[in-house]
Amino acid sequence: MNNTEFYDRLGVSKDASQDEIKKA
């Protein structure tokens, strides 16, 4: 999948920091 789908599945924005992504 592309990055947009990756972030969308996590429920975070493309501008989210790595820490926010890990928390998601």
Swiss-Prot record:
Keyword annotations from UniProtKB, A to Z: Chaperone, Cytoplasm, DNA replication, Metal-binding, Repeat, Stress response, Zinc
Keyword Chaperone recorded: yes
Every J domain range: 3-24
Highest taxon listed in the record's lineage: Bacteria
InterPro entries: J_dom_sf
Cellular component terms (Gene Ontology): cytoplasm
GO MF annotation, one: metal ion binding
Single Gene Ontology BP annotation: DNA replication
Cofactor remark: Binds 2 Zn(2+) ions per monomer.
Cofactors that this protein relies on: Zn(2+)
Membrane-spanning ranges: none
Subcellular location per the Swiss-Prot or TrEMBL entry: Cytoplasm
UniProt free text on domains: The J domain is necessary and sufficient to stimulate DnaK ATPase activity. Zinc center 1 plays an important role in the autonomous, DnaK-independent chaperone activity of DnaJ. Zinc center 2 is essential for interaction with DnaK and for DnaJ activity.
Protein family per UniProt: Belongs to the DnaJ family.
Role description: Participates actively in the response to hyperosmotic and heat shock by preventing the aggregation of stress-denatured proteins and by disaggregating proteins, also in an autonomous, DnaK-independent fashion. Unfolded proteins bind initially to DnaJ; upon interaction with the DnaJ-bound protein, DnaK hydrolyzes its bound ATP, resulting in the formation of a stable complex. GrpE releases ADP from DnaK; ATP binding to DnaK triggers the release of the substrate protein, thus completing the reaction cycle.
Subunit structure: Homodimer.
Protein name: Chaperone protein DnaJ
